[in-house]
From Swiss-Prot:
Family: Belongs to the LAMTOR5 family.
Subunit structure, interactors included: Part of the Ragulator complex.
Protein's UniProt keywords contain Nucleus: no
UniProt name for this protein: Ragulator complex protein LAMTOR5 homolog
Known function: Regulator of the TOR pathway, a signaling cascade that promotes cell growth in response to growth factors, energy levels, and amino acids. As part of the Ragulator complex, may activate the TOR signaling cascade in response to amino acids.
Matching InterPro entries: LAMTOR5
Annotated localization: Cytoplasm; Lysosome
Organismal lineage: Eukaryota, Metazoa, Ecdysozoa, Arthropoda, Chelicerata
Length: 91
């Protein structure tokens, strides 16, 4: 399972992201690459879980978009895995 995950995350980096991190349901980092901090894995998982509680009747998984002057972060949780993709903001 690890090789397909690493390949997928590397493809995300190749598409222009500056960092990517994948975490399990408990917030443990499964893999990271690029400019990310491993300690963010737990926060990413918690944010993704909380976002689902905003509208529990919704069938789709929410995507969280955090923006700053220097970084955009997209977070989404599917089944038992949370993913965050870091990119530079479009100007």
């Amino acid at each position: 399972m690890e090789a397909p995950l690493v390949k997928c995350l590397d493809e995300i980096l190749d598409s222009g992201a500056v960092g990517v991190i994948c975490a399990d349901k408990d917030g443990l980092a499964l893999h990271s690459a690029g400019q990310v901090q491993l300690r963010a894995a737990g926060v990413i998982t918690a944010l993704a879980s909380l976002a689902k509680q905003i509208d529990p009747s919704c069938d789709t998984t929410p995507t969280i978009h955090l923006e700053s002057d220097s970084l955009d972060v997209y977070i989404q949780q599917k089944e038992q895995v949370s993913l965050a993709v870091y990119s530079t903001p479009k100007k």
